[in-house]
Amino acid sequence: MSSALAPVGIFDSGVGGLTVARAIIDQLPDEHIIYVGDTGHGPYGPLSIPEVRAHALAIGDDLVGRGVKALVIACNTASAACLRDARERYEVPVVEVILPAVRRAVATTRNGRIGVIGTQATINSHAYQDAFAAARDTEITAVACPRFVDFVERGVTSGRQVLGLAEGYLEPLQRAQVDTLVLGCTHYPLLSGLIQLAMGDNVTLVSSAEETAKEVLRVLAERDLLHPHPDDPRAAGPSRVFEATGDPEAFTRLAARFLGPAVSGVRPVHHVRID
C-alpha cells in the first residue's frame, strides 16, 4: 500500500511535461515529485504506437519500482498509447492528460465547436475524438501540429518563423469557427502566446497541465494520499528530483529557461532501457 509520504512520479518525452509538473507544484506544494524526461527517445510524436508504449512503460516500471504513490503520464502521445496498459499493470493510480482537458473544454465552449491540436501520433490515435464522443452537441476539429514540439525542444518559442507555422497549422480551426482550443500536447502551453495571437482573443485555450494537476489532487485526496501539512511531524520539506534519459545538461538548460532555478542538477537515467 502506498504511503502519503511517497513521491508522485511524472514523465514525458521531454520538457513539455514540465508544464504539468509546474502545475502540480503550484497546486500541491507539499508533494515530493520525481520527473523523468525521456529525451533519449523523444519526441514521441513521430514514433509508432508500439514504440511509444514500450518507452513509456519502461519509465513507468522504473518509477513504480521506486515506490511512487501515483504515476502521471504527462504526455498526450503516451497517454493515448498506453493508458489502459499502465492502469492494468500498476497498483498505484495512473493519471493522464487527455480526459481532464476534454472535461474542461466541454464545460468552457459556448458554441459547441472545439478544436484539438496535438502531435501526429496523438491525432492519429483518435484518443481525443473518442473522449469527446460522449459529449452532446459538440463538433470536434482535430489538427496535427508536428513541428511545434521540435521548436519547443530547441528552446524556440517566439519569432516570426514559429508564428507563421502556427498560422498555417491553425487555419482549419479558424475556418471551423472553434471557440475553444485544447492544447493536446504538454509542450504546447509554452507556445500559448503565439497560439492565442494566431487564433484571436475570442478563442479560449485549454491547457491539459492545469486540469491534470487538479485531477492529481482529487485522486490523492480520494485515496488519503495527500502529503501531510508541513506542521505535521511526519512531514519533511518537499523534494523535486528531475531526471533525463538523454543529455542531462541540455535538459537542465532548456528546463531552467521555462521553469527557472527550480530545475537544477538534473540526473541522468541510464537504466531506463527498452528490451
Curated annotation (Swiss-Prot):
Active site positions, chain numbering: 75, 185
Pathway(s) served: Cell wall biogenesis; peptidoglycan biosynthesis
Enzymatic reactions: L-glutamate = D-glutamate
InterPro entries reported for this sequence: Asp/Glu/hydantoin_racemase, Asp/Glu_race, Asp/Glu_racemase_AS_1, Asp/Glu_racemase_AS_2, Glu_race
EC number in record: 5.1.1.3
Taxonomy, superkingdom: Bacteria
Entry keyword set: Cell shape, Cell wall biogenesis/degradation, Isomerase, Peptidoglycan synthesis
Gene3D superfamilies from the UniProt entry: 3.40.50.1860
Broad EC category: isomerase
Residues annotated as binding substrate: 12-13, 44-45, 76-77, 186-187
UniProt GO BP: cell wall organization; peptidoglycan biosynthetic process; regulation of cell shape
Molecular-function GO term, any one: glutamate racemase activity
HAMAP family recorded: Glu_racemase
Function, as annotated: Provides the (R)-glutamate required for cell wall biosynthesis.
Protein name stated in the entry: Glutamate racemase
Organism, as annotated: Mycolicibacterium paratuberculosis (strain ATCC BAA-968 / K-10)
